[in-house]
Amino acid sequence: VAARALLALVIVAGALVLAGCDASSIGRDPTTEGTTSILGRRAWVILTTDGGRRLVTRRSVRIERGDTALDVLSQVADVRLAPDGTIAQVNGEGGGALRTFGPEQAAWYFRVDGIESLGVRPDRFRVQPGQSIWWDLRRYDIYERLPVAVGTFPEPLFSGWRSDPRPLRIAHGADFQEDAEYFRDSIFERLDPDVVSIAGDGGVAGIGGEDAGGASDETDLPVAVRLGRANFIIGRWEELRLDPNLLDINLDSRFYGLTTFIAGTTIVRQDPDMEFTEELRDAEGLVWAATTDGEPDGTLAFVVTGITDEGVHAAARALRSGACQFYLACAVDRDGRVIR
């Protein structure tokens, strides 16, 4: 009997480990994920290079009270520190590759639940159970900052900046109400978000459709972004670009840390390791995330868009399936295949 009980315990523990390693974390409750009576307090550690283009490892690790971002990194990799306490190498990689005119400017950055933690020392950031700590080795001469990534969806829409969530608002274009309601019901049900049409939210003229005056300012301009909210937006770019916040982000991609964007009727990409932009000829759909002021604690805009209806639907499918994991932004063809 004792042997059977022990075997049952091992099977249960094994099942929990496998469940914790499921590639798709969509729809999980981030307040309890990774914390069980058998496995203890846990967090995810992700290790990539070049803005997520190369996945090195992804592991669920046990954490103790007081563990920092540096502590959990040390559980999955060999970490070497510089004399000033910054990270010099991880698994022997650090700094930039040697080029004709010297080494590239590159460093290790970490993000928490998809939001980059600039100015926060990793040996002082205390990790909480269920959090995702994503370390990436990337160049910093092209993008000074990359505030938000889509690769840990549905974060940061659940947890927000430093576990300070904001009310979720889902806005959709004219032909994407069903998609918006699907995300609400299957992924964000616990948050009970508003679902509104970007053309019919009663918005008025002003920055991002925010109230800027009396009745004389009323307009039919689409209202995709509300300041002070977590905004999940789905629709064709020709509709979404009428929102001033989204248009500004798309036009000044380097300032806002947007590595893939729409130029005219083409989706283009410039990852942190790319000197020049690249046209993605087969891309029709795109998922990107940013903040309205370029700061990690700013108003979040998480955008599912495209240059065709088919592209928008394909981007939504890719996001739901987990195909966009570990990407800063995610471009797809009309069949939902991620363009690497």
Model-predicted regions and their roles:
Residues V1-A8:
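Bacterial N-terminal signal peptides that target proteins for export
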Residues D22-D29:
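Bacterial lipoprotein signal-peptidase II cleavage site
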Residues P30-G34, R62-E64:
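A structural motif detector for short, solvent-exposed N-terminal "entry" segments of globular domains
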Residues T36-R59, P165-R166:
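Eukaryote-biased recognition of intrinsically disordered, low-complexity regulatory segments
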Residues G51-V61, D67-R80:
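OB-fold ssDNA-binding interfaces and closely related basic DNA-contact patches used
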